[in-house]
């Protein structure tokens, strides 16, 4: 039986509000020394023994009896088969979501550019896709096909040559929706491996698993810890914390809607965070009543209750202006502006992973099919981070072409600066290309 909900109530007018808010927002991962050491041992084993280590760890952690890596490779035909094993409605939903995600991300694609100066010097930027990206997908029955779309499609739009997906199949459990999503998203290769060992295989390569340039995708604490350790060998997307939603409401939205929006993140796990901010105290009471009324109807009521009681809050503010200030202080992963005129407040929002505008725009639409990416910065990192996008799978190279005149002119400036830093070879390298004015063009 679910315990009664006792969501925290805060008031921004209280003198110790800032301290209470900081305590509410604090979260530390549970990657302790033992987890860290186990991950390091796994990475070392994969680097040294390659496929053999992957087979051993898969047998140990996923409960599978496999003879070799050949048993852990899914051919393209298996992905296509998955499309026939899901319902027509599921396939249509995946295809519609994929089309919207693709359309949105195509607008993010950056192109190379150059400009030419008067003396013929050309400066610019060359935009190049990564050669190969690795996508980690959690396995088992609780896996998420939407994450496959959100991670793989931006990579393909960017022009990544090969997208390699790893997905564990604990006790042989294969999620057909995940494989169907991989087929629709254009994933090139799939290995049924998971955990820190899969991250290590992507980062360093084995006899069967190709080395990638970047590893993206969510996972448990072992996956997150492994991503930390391989960063530098490869790029990573981010180290994601628990899911978050912050709803700013003027008090005019149906309180049942708001309660369910809070549940939509709280149901992810016990550490997820759901916060409502409003200047209307009576409305906060109504939402609290809706939470109590609706919670018993939820399939994941225990998880929601633990999340709401442990990390949730209803925050009373002076007015909408202060609500926006609190939102910027929190820098949430998901921010709902459930107000009459969200466009009026949008310019003041500085820190948020995704902003959901208006009463009808539930966060769930963004999770699945609106188009923008649902891989978003958490734990306040929206202050300096962005959603996953096409730009995460592109890199930029500077282009510099100097004409004779340009090299001569720039050489004088470079010489002065280089000698000021006592780097004589730098200076002389530039000076060799300086020509007298009367010599230019001869």
Swiss-Prot record:
Cofactor(s) the protein needs: Zn(2+)
Pfam families given in the database record: Histidinol_dh
Class in the EC hierarchy, top level: oxidoreductase
Reactions catalysed according to its record: L-histidinol + 2 NAD(+) + H2O = L-histidine + 2 NADH + 3 H(+)
Active site: 333-334
InterPro entries, sorted: Ald_DH/histidinol_DH, Histidinol_DH_CS, Histidinol_DH_monofunct, Hstdl_DH
Protein name: Histidinol dehydrogenase
Organism annotation: Pseudomonas fluorescens (strain ATCC BAA-477 / NRRL B-23932 / Pf-5)
